[in-house]
């Protein structure tokens, strides 16, 4: 009988623990996925080559795919974008960004948090806020750029329609970070009336063509040091 009673207590404990986990899922948030080999290669490169720069451009594939030094030839600009990166990924490599002692850091990140990791707006904004704080503590002024949406008609992944509303919500909250040495730049010139990326600025629904990068440059040029 004592063994049966003990078994019942164990089962009850397991049931209550499971119920608590269901009731409070945030207490057991999924860990971030491991970094890709490309992420590790790029982050390692950034650590190995840390020449001083006026500006660091930080982000995911949209940032990674641009030739920023050619776009702003009068400034020492380094590309610190990594294809597929997320807010958590950027937080993991802040030291490599600050190693170039940038006067100003331009950040645009977030779409992969929603599309690949299915995170909430609250979680992404929380990480974004920590990122801005850490960059400021490292001596850089920060320019937060609105996160660009995707084009649902052209994007290969079907979740684009679900991602764009979350990007809009994130951007509304990012604008509130513009205090003190932090500025916010809206890239609304690249966004269509339906809230997606403009048809004429992308071939695959996510990444920009040359005209898209021209408009991006025009939007941020006034904020260059």
Where are these regions (language model features)?
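Catalytic His-Asp segment of secreted/periplasmic serine-dependent ester chemistry enzymes
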Residues: 149-225
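A short helix->loop->beta-strand "cap" motif at the edges of active sites that frequently abuts
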Residues: 138-140
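N-terminal post-signal-peptidase region of extra-cytosolic proteins
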Residues: 39-44, 86-92
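Short beta->alpha junction loops
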Residues: 80-85, 188
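N-terminal secretory targeting modules
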Residues: 1-56, 68, 99-100, 157, ...
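Oxyanion-hole/transition-state-stabilizing segment in secreted/luminal serine hydrolases
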Residues: 58, 63-78, 88-127, 134, ...
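Short, basic, glycine/proline-bearing loop/turn elements
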Residues: 30-32, 76-80
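A general structural detector for well-ordered alpha-helical segments in enzyme core domains, enriched
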Residues: 93, 124-131, 163-166, 170-174
């Amino acid at each position: 009988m004592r063994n049966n009673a003990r078994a019942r207590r164990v089962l009850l404990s397991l049931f209550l623990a499971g119920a608590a986990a269901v009731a409070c899922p945030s207490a057991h948030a999924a860990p971030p996925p491991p970094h890709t080999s490309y992420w590790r290669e790029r982050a390692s490169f950034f650590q190995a080559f840390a020449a001083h720069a006026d500006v660091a451009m930080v982000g995911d594939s949209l940032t990674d795919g641009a030739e920023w030094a050619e776009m702003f030839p009068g400034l020492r600009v380094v590309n610190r974008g990594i294809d597929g990166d997320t807010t958590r990924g950027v937080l993991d490599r802040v030291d490599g960004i600050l190693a170039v002692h940038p006067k100003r850091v331009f950040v645009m990140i977030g779409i992969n948090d929603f599309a690949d990791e299915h995170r909430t707006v609250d979680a992404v904004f929380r990480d974004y806020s920590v990122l801005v704080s850490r960059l400021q503590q490292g001596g850089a002024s920060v320019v937060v750029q609105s996160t660009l949406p995707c084009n649902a008609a052209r994007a290969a992944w079907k979740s684009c329609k679900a991602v764009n509303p979350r990007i809009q919500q994130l951007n509304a909250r990012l604008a509130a970070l513009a205090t003190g040495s932090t500025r916010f730049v809206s890239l609304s010139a690249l966004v269509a009336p339906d809230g997606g990326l403009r048809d004429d600025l992308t071939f695959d629904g996510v990444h920009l063509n040359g005209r898209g990068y021209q408009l991006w440059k025009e939007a941020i040029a006034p904020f260059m040091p």
